[in-house]
A protein has these predicted regions:
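Bacterial N-terminal signal peptides that target proteins for export
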Residues: 1-8
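Cleavable N-terminal signal peptides
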Residues: 8-9, 19
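Hydrophobic ligand-binding cavity/cleft-lining segments
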Residues: 19-67
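Amphipathic hydrophobic-ligand
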Residues: 24, 109-116
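Glycine-rich portal/gate segments that line the openings of hydrophobic small-molecule binding cavities
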Residues: 33, 62-109, 126, 163-175
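Stable alpha-helical elements in mature extracytoplasmic
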Residues: 37-38, 44-50, 85, 153, ...
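A conserved amphipathic terminal alpha-helix motif
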Residues: 128, 135-175
């Protein structure tokens, strides 16, 4: 009888574990080469509250806590579709031209999101901008509904990164 109870308990734990299994950590890494010096490119993206100047999906950004480019600052992005995303600056390194931030809340289908954007030299008067992020899908069920799965979260973030990087290149390289 004791074995039967242990078996039932183990079976229940296995089933409940699969229903509430932790979503895997997902990664996105996108980059673009821009025909401009790293200082010029960094000048365009360096302000934590300046995303709307180069990302086409962001209509407005504003600091809602702390000070621009200071660790701990929070910004609210208002997207062109009306949605909002609140982000917190985790690290800022002007010397190495990079910053790291986390999404605190918002309309994107991700959770536990942390990203870094950086600019490095890529030859004479050329720069490589790299945007990397780690995150989980927002929906926590082991079998999420369609459009709430890992593929949707990854595809969304690739789209966000590509739109921003491609527009940044276009703006900087425009005659």
């Amino acid at each position: 009888m004791k074995r039967l109870h242990l078996f039932a308990f183990a079976s229940l734990m296995a089933v409940s574990g699969s229903v509430f299994a932790a979503a895997p950590v997902l990664n996105v890494r996108e980059s673009v080469t821009v025909h401009a010096s790293p200082d010029v490119v960094w000048g365009k993206i360096r302000d934590f509250d300046g995303v709307s100047a180069w990302h086409p999906a962001v209509a407005k950004d504003q600091i809602i806590a702390g000070s621009n480019n200071m660790v701990g600052a929070e910004r609210m992005l208002t997207l062109r579709n009306g949605g909002t995303v609140t982000e917190k600056l985790l690290a800022y390194d002007a010397r190495h031209r990079r910053y790291r931030y986390a999404i605190r809340m918002g309309v994107l289908p991700v959770s536990d999101y942390v990203a870094t954007i950086s600019v490095k030299a890529a030859g004479l008067n050329r720069s490589k901008v790299t945007w990397t992020g780690t995150f989980k899908r927002k929906h926590v069920a082991a079998n999420p509904p369609a459009n709430a799965d890992d593929a949707t979260a990854t595809k969304t973030m690739v789209g966000v990164y590509r739109a921003g990087l491609d527009n940044l290149k276009k703006i900087i390289e425009a005659p």
